[in-house]
Amino acid sequence: MAKIKIMPCLDMREGRVVKGVHFVDIADAGDPVECAKAYCAAGADELALLDITATVEKRATLADVVKRVAEVCTVPFTVGGGINSVEAAGVVLKAGANKISTSSAAFRNPQLIPDLIKEFGVDAVTVAIDVDVNPALPSGYEVYIDGGRTATGFDAVEFAKKVDGYGIKTILPTSKAGDGAKTGYDLPVIKAMHDVCNAEIVASGGAGKLEHFAEAAEAGATVLLAASVFHFHMIDIPELKRYLADRNFDVAL
C-alpha cells in the first residue's frame, strides 16, 4: 500500500489565506506564513499554496508570498495559480517552491507540460484539473478552467489520461461541486483517474470529516488535500493521521 500524505492547501488572495465554497463566497483564514508554520509543526507531509485569482486576473503568482512561506516551510511545497509559462514557473521555483502546479494554461496549451518537465524535471510539475459533473460526457465529468469559471466541454478523465501520457507524476483533480462544501471528496472522479493513470492522484475538494479522508484513500488517492477543515480547526492533522493509521493506512506519524 502506498504511503498516504496529508496536504493542507493555502488558497491565496491579496496576500491572505482565504477559503470559499464552490470556488466563491470567500472568507479570510489567516496569514500564509503563520499558517505554513503551524501546518509544518502539526505534521503536514506536504503543503500547497494556490493563488486563486492569478489566472483570471492575468498576472503572475505572488512570488514575494512564496518566498516568505518557503522560508518557514519544512515540507515539500507546491505553488499554483498563474503558472502559464516556463518563465513563470521558474520565478516561483526560484522563490523557494519545490513544485509548481499548472491548470488552465496546461489545458489551453498541453505542450507546456513537456516543456516544464524538460526544464525543471518531472518531480517538480503537478497538473491540476478542476472538474464538475456533466452527464453528457463519457466519464460524467467536465474540465473547467479559469478558477472554475469556464466550462470547456472536454471530458476530465480523458484529459487526465492525456496528461498522464506525458509522464507526469502528480495529477490534482478538484471537484467544483465539492470545493469547501465539506460533504466529502468526489470519489468517482478520484477512482476513474486512478484507474487510467500511472500518476499519483491528489484528492481535493470536499473534505468535511475524518471518514472522507479514508474514503478518498480507498478510492485511490495517495495525497489528501484539504483547506477549510484545517484552517478553521475542525480537524487537526495528528488526529487525522491517527484515524488513518488505526484503519491500516500507511501514514507518517
What do these predicted regions represent?
Residues 46-65, 104, 172-183:
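Glycine-rich, proline-tolerant flexible connector loops at the mouths of alpha/beta enzymes
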Residues 11, 39, 47, 79, ...:
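Conserved, mostly hydrophobic/aromatic
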Residues 60-67, 110, 152-157, 183-191:
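Charged helix-capping and loop-helix junction motifs
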